[in-house]
Amino acid sequence: MMFTPLIVLTLLVLATAEHQCGPNEQWSDCPGCELQCGESDKPCPAMCGDPKCYCSPDQYRRIPDGRCIRKIQCPQH
C-alpha cells in the first residue's frame, strides 16, 4: 500500500514530461500540418497527425535544426 503514492507520483511526472515542448512549440493530441521554411505552399490534408509538439501557429519549422522561428527568419532559398 505504501508504494501506491510513489507509483502515482512517478506516472504523473512521466506524463507531464512527455508534453514539454521547446521554444515556440505547443503540444497537440491532434496536430494538423506544420509550416516549414520553404514549404509554405505545400498542400495540407484536413486530418490529425500523431500527437506531438509542433510549432505555434505563427511559427515555421526550420530545417535542419528543427527550431520554430518566425517566417521572416527563414533562410532564403
Curated annotation (Swiss-Prot):
GO cellular component assignments: extracellular region
Span of domain TIL: 21-74
Disulfide feature: C21-C53, C30-C48, C33-C44, C37-C74, C55-C68
Domain of life (superkingdom): Eukaryota
Residues spanning the signal sequence: 1-17
Biological function: Defends the organism against the host's proteinases.
The name this protein goes by in its record: Serine protease inhibitor 1
Species this protein is from: Anisakis simplex
